[in-house]
């Protein structure tokens, strides 16, 4: 277990350096498993574009606050510096920032709670990873999901945290499956499935994210595109809720599953990554639907919970493919090939 008994004073002194900026950007990139500062920068550009386009600029600024707070917390807790250099303290925090300002009204107490929750994710991530280590999986984005659920539930009884944009608790009922099915419409739904990874409802942001992924890892971009398309196809043929389809809400967890299984935890080859990644994407769509039904009566969003559940389902069995070590899952924190940041200086 990482020592949490003293402040990383050297790290704190570097908070206003260019190295710290790169660490923040990598934290943004690590939401989709990319340890690349340029990718993180493009993700932030996409977040700002989509947030302002949708008239929700505070979502973008919440993302920045969450990213900074969760990263600084890693230094304050003196967590392993390698995790910090790779941006692994920041990715849950940036999602917390997006989530808070998507679902809660903006008050002083909302921002205070955002700071507390973002800081908590860094601590919780360490704990969850310690618990999951014997199973050879990690917590993925579940620290964001778990802590945000806690605060969103608390908002129901705390007037300082107005649940202004949360759905009211209700039992699942009838819904309309009718949507426009033109090629342009389907293209928008597909791109929104990618943009919703950061809770952004913008097809332009989806383009930003695809370009950002391609800058770091072309296969990550390809799997993101495939995952969003396949999840869209599945929810259409199974006649899911039209409003959810139009807003890309069945795509974002599948996108994360596709990247995770296709480029991170399974070695990229036809027999392992391709087969199991496609299976994981399919399962994610059904997990998404099931979790929607499960959480609707308490008025909670699924966030990236379906991605976590589906990915764990495909990692926990410790599959061994065809007896070849090269085709077996990589159960390390992240695949070593995704830890490089071409052109960036060594931060040691």
Place the predicted regions along the sequence by residue.
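Membrane-helix interface "capping/anchor" motifs
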Residues: 53-56, 76-88, 106-111, 127-137, ...
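Generic multipass alpha-helical transmembrane bundles of integral membrane proteins
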Residues: 147, 152-229, 233, 237, ...
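Alpha-helical transmembrane segments in multi-pass membrane proteins
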Residues: 46, 50, 58, 62-74, ...
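Short hydrophobic alpha-helical membrane-embedded segments
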Residues: 15-23, 30-42, 63-64, 84-94, ...
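Membrane-interface helix-loop-helix junctions at boundaries between adjacent transmembrane segments
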Residues: 86-89, 93-174, 296
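Membrane-interfacial segments
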Residues: 77, 81, 128, 132, ...
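N-terminal signal-anchor module of multipass membrane proteins
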Residues: 1-79, 193-197, 206-216, 301, ...
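Hydrophobic alpha-helical transmembrane segments in multi-pass integral membrane proteins
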Residues: 105-106, 154-163, 238-248, 286-297
């Amino acid at each position: 277990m990482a020592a949490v008994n003293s402040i990383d004073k050297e790290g704190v002194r570097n908070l206003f350096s260019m190295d710290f900026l790169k660490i923040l950007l990598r934290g943004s990139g690590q939401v989709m498993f990319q340890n690349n500062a340029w990718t993180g920068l493009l993700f932030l550009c996409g977040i700002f574009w989509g947030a302002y386009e949708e008239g929700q600029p505070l979502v973008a600024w919440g993302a920045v606050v969450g990213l900074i707070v969760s990263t600084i917390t890693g230094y304050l807790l003196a967590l392993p510096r390698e995790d910090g250099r790779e941006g692994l303290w920041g990715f849950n925090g940036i999602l917390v920032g997006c989530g808070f300002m998507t679902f809660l009204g903006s008050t002083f107490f909302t921002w205070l709670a955002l700071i507390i929750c973002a800081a908590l994710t860094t601590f919780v991530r360490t704990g969850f990873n310690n618990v999951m280590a014997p199973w050879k999986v990690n917590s993925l984005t579940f620290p964001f999901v778990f802590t945000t659920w806690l605060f969103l539930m608390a908002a129901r009884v705390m007037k300082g945290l107005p649940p202004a944009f949360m759905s009211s608790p209700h039992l699942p009922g009838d819904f309309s499956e009718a949507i426009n099915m033109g090629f342009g419409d389907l293209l928008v739904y597909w791109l929104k499935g990618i943009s919703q990874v950061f809770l952004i409802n913008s097809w332009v942001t989806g383009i930003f994210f695809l370009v950002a992924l391609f800058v770091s890892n072309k296969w990550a971009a390809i799997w993101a595109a495939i995952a969003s398309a396949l999840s869209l196809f599945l929810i259409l043929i199974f006649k899911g809720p039209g409003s959810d389809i139009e807003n890309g809400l069945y795509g974002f967890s599948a996108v994360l599953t596709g990247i995770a299984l296709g480029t991170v935890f399974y070695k990229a080859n036809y027999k392992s990554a391709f087969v199991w990644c496609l299976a994981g994407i399919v399962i994610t769509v059904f997990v998404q639907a099931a979790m929607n039904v499960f959480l609707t009566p308490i008025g909670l969003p699924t966030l990236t919970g379906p991605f976590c559940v589906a990915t764990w389902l495909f990692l926990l069995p410790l599959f061994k493919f065809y007896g070849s070590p090269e085709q077996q899952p990589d159960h390390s924190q992240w695949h070593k090939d995704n830890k490089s940041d071409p052109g960036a200086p060594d931060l040691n």
